Amino acid sequence: MSSERRPELEETAVDPATGSAASRKFSIVQDAVETTIVAPTNHGPSPRFSTLVRNLFEPLVNLSAVVAALRKKPTEAKAHIASQFIKGWVEEVGKDIYPAFRLILPDKDRERAVYGLKEKALGRLWVKVLNLAKDSPDAKALSEWKQGGNESAGNFSKRCYEVLSKRTSLTDYGHMTVDEVNERLDLLADGETDQAKQIEILTYFYKHMNATELKWLVNIILRQMKMNATEKVFFEPWHPDAESLFNVTASLKRVCWELTDPTKRLTSAEAQVSLFACFMPQIAAFPKYSGQDIAGKHFKGRPFYIEEKIDGERMQMHMSEYGNKFHWWSRRSKDFTETYGNSLDDASGSLTKRLRGIINPKVRNCVLDGEMVAYDPATKKIIPFGTLRTANRNEQNDLNLTKPMFMVFDILLLNDKPLVDYTLAERKRTLRTIFARTDNETVGQEGVLEVLPYTEATTAAEIETCMRKIIAESSEGLVIKDPTSVYRVNTRDDSWLKMKPEYMSEFGEKLDVVIIGGYYGSGKRGSILSSYLCGLRADGSDQFWSFFKVGGGLTAGDYQAIRTKTEGKWKRWDKNDKPKNVLLAGPNGDLERPDVWIEPSDSVVVEVKAASVVASDQYKVGLCLRFPRFRALRLDKTWEDGLTISQFAELRQTVEMEAENKELELEDRKRRNAGPGRGAKRLKLANVSSDEDELGTDERPTSVFKATSFAVLSDMSSPRYMSKAAVENLIKKHGGTVFQTVEGPHTIPVADTRTIKVQALTKRVHGVDVIRPNWLLDCINEEKLVALEPRNLLESSAETLALAKTNVDEFGDSYTRPLTYKEMQEVLRFMDQFDLDQTNPPDLMMEVLETNDGAVPKGMLFYGKKVYMSTSNMDTVALETQFRAYDALRCLQFGGANLVTDMKDLVVAVAKTEEEAKELRRVSSEQVFPFRVVSIKWVEESWKNGTVEIEDDYPL
């Protein structure tokens, strides 16, 4: 096979209506030599579309029956089905299998334009085709396709089948051929914006296909075949080099038309990345290890490269003839040449005209791999990916507008020489030589085309240092690469690993928990359990309390193993007949209720890890795991080996102590690095105690709580976190008695959050006073029982609250004890606001006073969330920003936010300006657990929408 046929340049127009010769050939060009590739000629007529449905699609979906009949493994059964179909096609139709492959692998077909139809739009079209009333059950079934308890929930094509099978006039398969279906689909793609044309085409399909055929037609239009088979299943029986050619050309047509003889193999040159042939790029895998283990276990002390993970669009650049020809493709093989330019002289392109003089004049041709980003010339920063489309449209002569910039991290071809088999280290060295400007730190030209910098490292500490740097710069994450690896097209393996900040702060222990419930998924998982409810065992009992849901990290093999072990043991959740051994949260015991549940004794133990543990009223334990990930199925353990509530509490205390030790080590490093005389001096105020005093950490026992009984009902969240067990130990250390339940009127309930126990207590005992743990710290610091203040009350009677208010002035300043430094800052801040409030009463304050009929009152919108927002240097910002900042601060206060001045254990910081945001990100990067930095708009949008918005959506 001639090497001249490698790179595809352009294809002649296709006329699906006439089937003219123009659709039977296309040209490829290399070094000015044009070769025309002609489609093979079939000797038989186009078969019916039903042939694909009956002989391929349905057998692959109902694989278990085929496996049983053939007595083969599932992978062998898939290969058998595909090879038999291909063999039959070649014998009965001919060697041009492209018409069939377009329908079998619609997501790989670059020749057909997009339909512009997803599930929602397609559902509306079917409603019109079937002439359904909008409020009819079937119309609702199509629009609400993810809902319902039947098998079709989450599977749009199955939902369409249920609706269409009631109405279609055809009970047997239709007579439409493969060619006819392709022609109509081409027309549907051409009529992307013409709804009348779309309805006409779908109506034709409806009249000429039965419900099963229509189900598969829907999958083809959505380009989601849902038949549990990748392109490899079909490529292997077609030609031994089919996958290799597709990986370096991304062309289904070339695979079908060039590889018609399985005995003729590709040369090594033809299987290489080549000019103007879109290849499938290598992508980074998720790590199996933590940062510590990546350095130690994965690389075993060998060097590795650390790159910043760029927030952009993966792009490959092909250049030839010293810049006279360019071609650009995305990761999904979408052609962006018209957008970015086809030559250095292309005035309409948004990038190539700016590349003149950047690429070394000795470079005749090259293929580069990188990330296309949006660049702001004013700030000289890369800005969020969502702005890239706007940057592409901006007028290039306006220097103040955002523009696309190409961040290059790999080179795969240089002056006709493929480099994919060279090591990454060799490719990196080559990459630096192809750009004319290498006289400063930036290789390439800033704002136009740059080579992505990298750091060579060998230790986990270097990974953590880089991670903290990208947190400070509000970047996306890191990519860690093996410098000895070759480039592997269309591969995701551990030679490239991607890490995000969340992966760095895992809850340090593996947890063995029991699955107690399951949830059905959507899409591919519509008919199977895609996530599981896990629980902790109540000590000395066979009851399990709900703890968290997990779905991440499970492979197809894991799902299958769990299904095998639990088959036939699942039961539908019945709110009127709840299980005795599976307990959920909520007054009615139905929060986070699963679709199905299982007796713990019939279930399995799974090993999970998570980013952190957070308080949650949604789960019976009162806590849940943040970002849990499945690690392993523990078939060596039974339900009795599952983690108990008390075991988890002990484990959590150990983890917290390790985190505190790590923080102390970090502080020691900072002090050592600061040098003598560099530490900031502490200001001591009259009637103000230190922050250390506030924490009540004095090791000297006292008898301050002698003859006093407490029942601790939750962890302490402010002024710092302390577990329930730690609070109980603190009480005992200072002479108090601890009960696990409220034993009569002389037992003081203590809690910082409204857990299930607190809610049950307030329902059972009207007007009960629930004291916050900060009162315990006040008493220990003063070495006596101090008067209650409003800040000490979680729940109270009107009388207790009125009495507590008499112990502070109108600004919250205590009459009975010295304030801590933090409290004094809060009082001063409130006093400043008090004068402003008298003259400019904001609408938001009045809004808080109104009755809220939503699920979450605005008075609790930010409840429990630790937020930092400074009002210093307000006179240096614009007047409008000042008003917005004060309004945002009031929203946080009235919404129950825990406003703090210390960055320790912070969750989110609100910045007024970009300069402040930059400084906050720097501080965040130095914390053991980094916090999020958001703009004022995060507060405004959360308040307006009545829900706390995702912080990552509001950067500054």
UniProtKB/Swiss-Prot annotation:
Disulfide bonds: none annotated. Residues 666-700 are annotated as: Disordered. Mg(2+) 2 binds at residue 476. The active site is at 309 (n6-amp-lysine intermediate). Gene3D superfamilies: BRCT domain, DNA ligase, ATP-dependent, N-terminal domain, DNA ligase/mRNA capping enzyme, Nucleic acid-binding proteins. GO terms for biological process: DNA biosynthetic process; DNA recombination; double-strand break repair via classical nonhomologous end joining; double-strand break repair via nonhomologous end joining; nucleotide-excision repair, DNA gap filling. GO terms for molecular function: ATP binding; DNA binding; DNA ligase (ATP) activity; metal ion binding. InterPro entries: Adenylation_DNA_ligase_IV, BRCT_dom, BRCT_dom_sf, DNA_ligase_ATP-dep, DNA_ligase_ATP-dep_C, DNA_ligase_ATP-dep_cent, DNA_ligase_ATP-dep_N, DNA_ligase_N_sf. Residues 700-793, 857-956 form the BRCT domain. PANTHER family: DNA LIGASE 4. Belongs to the ATP-dependent DNA ligase family. This is DNA ligase 4. It comes from Yarrowia lipolytica (strain CLIB 122 / E 150) (Yeast). The gene is LIG4.
